[in-house]
Regions:
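Bacterial N-terminal signal peptides
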Residues: 5-14
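N-terminal amphipathic/hydrophobic interface segments
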Residues: 20-548
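Sec/Tat signal peptide C-region and signal peptidase I cleavage site
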Residues: 15-19
């Protein structure tokens, strides 16, 4: 008799509520299994209380099932509040466990609390409070959550899960922990089927032998492969790579950069710049192009080397640098040009190959090939050698003539990175303009000697010429020496090619070059939208053609 009265009471509650809410779009929460049920209007006015009788209480609403130990159903509000050992299932898209859930059938929203665990076939989400919106198929938390999938453990203070897309959107103190790396980020999107992460704020990736920083980027956590932008930096292979756009592939041991790239090598005190560069760790090599320049710190001065391409190979302390073609050097007290530069750090030898020219002070130096030798211990310039057709030319300050010394071989000696002495050996000759104390021209001296030594002052100008062996020659009055005889056969004045500052190492054509336009990494839905737009445009064109 007591149970009959209870059923009558339930009908009395439910019938008015149905009359009040007759919106056909709103579906009622169904009682699949009620177990034991009671009414306590003092504690739960207008509600029915359902309790497990050994089998769990079960409710259903538009494809969502809720099992629990205890539930309070407000039929008028289309609201159920469940307690104790709760299990929720929505088709094959998600399963959820908790100790508390409040589900609103009118809004199709839920709040789950206490040891909340949400699962699907690709991931598990754990938190203490989770909000579920079935209209948008989204679940989100605001007070720390942990997500695990096949490869990674992800945590954040706040986060959202898009059930249909199988995508997480994390904000605030985001961390991805993998056995091979750790990601710390402000904001990121993560796709569980692929393991791809997209960054939208300050992000650091720390791997076993690399570290990445960016503020916009993409990372495949399964392949350790990524694309990074906005203040992007990669620390890899004892180098720091910066640029507008960076790419990294751990498996291939490869990193590259595009636009305004900078490679800092602290071991060798060098900086390399350009608009495209590659680092191949397995090959111990680095390749830079598109306005490349390598900057070496020499005491308090910097030396700039530029060519169309720069290739650096070899391990530290045994690197080889190749600069080609149209190679150029700028240093405050020395400049050079040639077809290519070949420099070896182990030997300290730098070779200038192909029509080389070196300027120091007011002097121009040419020959078939020029070698610069550095002291590998002090890393200072030590000496200079010019092989075959060595020629030093200095424009005369009081006339339109040129002072010249030539020989088969030239040896130069540096002191504190400044060229101080030049020795000419074998078949040496000189042409010098001679003046008296009143700076009046006395004549032009043409001499031949087996060994000539030049001493240079602080301004790198010739201050003294010494003939080591007895010279042979004459002093000619200016009007007695034909202009063609005032220059050696090898003479070419290349002063108009001289590089006067570090910006002039680039050709006029290179100065006009602009960085390429870079597009950021696109998420799958962005690609889908673009493809949909493209398909729509193609359909429209097809339709127009059909009408014609």
């Amino acid at each position: 008799m007591r149970y009959i009265l209870l059923i009558i009471s339930l009908l009395a509650i439910s019938l008015p509520s149905l009359a009040q809410n007759n919106d056909p779009k709103i579906k009622r929460i169904e009682i699949v299994y009620g177990g034991e049920f009671t009414i306590d209007n003092a504690k739960y006015p207008g509600a029915t209380i359902f309790k497990s009788d050994g089998n769990k209480v079960q409710f259903r609403h538009q494809g969502l099932d809720i099992w629990c130990n205890l539930a309070v159903l407000y039929e008028e509000k289309n609201l159920v509040i469940a307690h104790g050992d709760i299990f929720v299932q929505q088709g094959d898209t998600l399963q959820m466990n908790s100790q508390y859930i409040s589900y609103n059938g009118n809004l199709k929203t839920a709040v789950a609390k206490e040891n909340v665990v949400l699962k699907n076939e690709t991931m598990t989400l754990e938190t203490e409070e989770l909000f579920l919106d079935r209209n948008t198929q989204e679940a989100y938390y605001n007070n720390f959550g942990k997500i695990t999938d096949v490869e990674n453990e992800l945590t954040s203070k706040t986060g959202k899960y898009f059930i249909t897309k199988k995508k997480n959107q994390f904000t605030n103190s985001v961390k991805i922990v993998n056995k091979d790396f750790v990601v710390d980020s402000q904001i990121l999107d993560y796709y569980h089927p692929t393991g791809n992460a997209y960054f939208y704020g300050a992000t650091t990736i720390t791997g076993q032998d690399y570290k990445v920083y960016c503020e916009r980027g993409f990372y495949d956590t399964r392949k350790e492969e990524g694309y990074f932008m906005k203040n992007a930096t990669i620390d890899y292979d004892l180098k720091t790579l910066k640029g507008d756009s960076l790419y990294f592939d751990k498996k291939k041991q490869f990193a590259s950069g595009t636009n305004n790239i900078v490679v800092i090598d602290t071991i060798n005190n060098t900086i390399v710049k350009g608009h495209y560069g590659e680092i191949h760790k397995a090959k111990d090599s680095m390749f830079i192009t598109k306005k490349p320049v390598i900057i070496s710190l020499i005491e308090k001065d910097s030396m700039y080397m530029h060519g169309k391409k720069i290739l650096v190979t070899g391990k530290e302390q045994n690197r080889t640098i190749r600069v080609f073609p149209d190679a150029r050097i700028f240093k405050s007290d020395m400049q050079a040009k040639c077809d290519s530069i070949h420099s070896n750090e182990f030997s300290g030898l730098t070779q200038l190959i192909g029509k080389p020219v070196v300027w120091t002070g007011e002097s121009q130096m040419t020959g078939d090939s020029i070698h610069l030798i550095a002291n590998t211990k002090t890393e200072q310039l030590d000496s200079l050698k010019v092989f075959n057709n060595a020629l030093v030319v200095e424009k005369d300050t009081l006339s339109d003539g040129y002072n010249q010394v030539k020989g088969k071989v030239l040896y130069g000696k540096f002191k504190k990175n400044q060229l101080k002495q030049i020795d000419f050996l074998q078949n040496t000759e000189s042409i010098y303009y001679v003046y008296n104390d009143k700076k009046e021209m006395v004549g032009i001296n043409k001499l031949t000697c087996s060994h000539i030594k030049l001493h240079l002052d602080e301004q790198q100008q010739v201050e003294k010429v010494v003939f080591i062996t007895q010279p042979v020659g004459d002093l000619y009055p200016e009007d007695k020496l034909h202009k063609n005889d005032r220059k050696f056969r090898e003479f070419i004045w290349r002063g108009d090619e001289r590089i006067t500052n570090k910006d002039e190492i680039f050709s006029e054509e290179e100065k006009k070059q602009q960085p390429i336009k870079i597009q950021g990494p696109k998420e799958p839905e962005e690609v889908d939208i673009e493809e949909a737009k493209l398909n729509a445009e193609q359909d429209e064109e097809t339709s127009t053609e059909t009408e014609k």
